[in-house]
Swiss-Prot record:
Taxonomic classification: Eukaryota, Metazoa, Chordata, Craniata, Vertebrata
Gene designation: mapda
Any one GO BP annotation for this protein: inosine biosynthetic process
A GO molecular-function descriptor: N6-methyl-AMP deaminase activity
Catalytic activity: N(6)-methyl-AMP + H2O + H(+) = IMP + methylamine
EC number: 3.5.4.-
Binding site for Zn(2+): H18, H20, H202, D287
Name of the protein in question: N6-Methyl-AMP deaminase
């Protein structure tokens, strides 16, 4: 990790709602994977964007390709998922929604079904081992793979929504935003919504996607990932902002990811400020803590130092995130109770 966050931000109970499994793999876990697969000739520099470095969004997607080569069997997925969950818990995250695109790898016999089952097994094992975190899973649709695969993924997600005892709660739409068009995936997303899956969609991650965003906001999604170019100052439109505000759709904010991936020029120019000042629901997230060398404590500290938030304001930001989770009501109530219990000792 680049810098240690202060104790207050570490102790702060947190909710993480935008975390891609493969992008969240830490330096230490990468080390183990690289050692296990020397024939791939992969170096650390290929899997993480170090401090002060910037990459284009395209280069960031190249990093994921490398990570996918390292994580290609059930054994890898189990190890990676468990370590990611443990690391979030160690950082004071009390509730986590992980997301990942189910993949099949013929060489290792991995199927999409087994991919999801293995992530669920990792979640189960962490719970059994007493790791202090509640974890749910969003099945991801990679937009690059087109409408047919999207429909198959939705079908899988639907099956797991019914069979995973509440662990699978929703669907994520992600992948390279410059590939494909949302209109081709609309039917699959609508089907997901109809069967009770919550939708977290990456929207307006790159400029000039007004038509697609307009279309997808009509669904509407339950949360927006990034939403970097929604407002008119950055090439979005008033009508997009109105839609988002009218429907009160929470925005998943990923500060470090956007700055290191160069979709935002600097922290102080981040769109968090625009939405936060409007009083719109925002939740701070890491996106890919491994790739971008960050953690959620750091993201909170960055937001506080960049935008002058008091500890009280930071606490409220963290607590409000409970309401934006896809967790069932009893879980939300339990989390509220946890926050209330911790407030006195942490917020002095």
């Amino acid at each position: 990790m680049d810098t240690e966050a202060d104790l207050f931000y570490r102790q702060l109970p947190k909710v993480e709602l935008h975390a891609h499994l493969n992008g969240s793999v830490s330096f230490e876990t990468m080390e183990k994977l690289i050692k296990r697969k020397p024939h791939l000739n992969i170096e650390h520099s290929m899997t993480a964007i170090r401090r002060g470095q910037r990459r284009t969004l395209d280069e960031c997607f190249q990093v994921f390709k490398v990570i996918h080569q390292l994580v290609d069997s059930e054994e890898d997925i189990l190890m990676v998922a468990k370590s990611v969950i443990q690391e979030f818990a160690a950082d004071g995250v009390k509730y986590l929604e992980l997301r990942s695109t189910p993949r099949e790898v013929t060489e290792t016999g991995l199927s999409k079904q087994r991919y999801i089952e293995t992530v669920l097994e990792a979640i189960r094992q962490c719970k059994q081992e007493g790791v202090d975190i509640d974890v749910r899973f969003l099945v991801a649709v990679d937009r690059r793979h087109g409408p047919e695969v999207a429909m198959q993924t939705v079908k899988l997600a639907e099956d797991f929504l019914l069979s995973s005892d509440g662990t699978v709660v929703g669907l994520d739409l992600s992948g390279d935003p410059t590939v494909g068009h949302g209109k081709d995936l609309l039917a699959a997303l609508q089907k997901a919504k109809n069967c009770g899956l919550k939708l977290a969609l990456h929207l307006s991650e790159v400029p000039s996607q007004i038509d697609e965003t307009e279309l997808l906001l009509n669904l509407p999604p339950d949360r927006i990932g990034h939403g970097t170019f929604l407002h008119p100052d950055v090439g979005g439109s008033d009508s997009l902002v109105d839609k988002v505000c009218k429907q009160n759709i929470p925005i998943e904010i990923c500060l470090t990811s956007n700055v290191k991936g160069q979709t935002v020029p600097s922290y102080d120019k981040h769109h968090f400020k625009y939405w936060y000042n409007r009083g719109h629901p925002c939740v701070l997230c890491t996106d890919d803590k491994g790739v971008f060398c960050t953690d959620l404590s750091q993201e909170y500290q960055l937001a506080a130092s960049t935008f002058g938030l008091t500890k009280e304001a930071v606490w409220i930001l963290s607590q409000q995130a409970i309401g934006y989770t896809f967790a069932p009501e009893p879980i939300k109530q339990r989390l509220e109770k946890t926050w209330a219990e911790l407030k006195q000792q942490i917020l002095q």
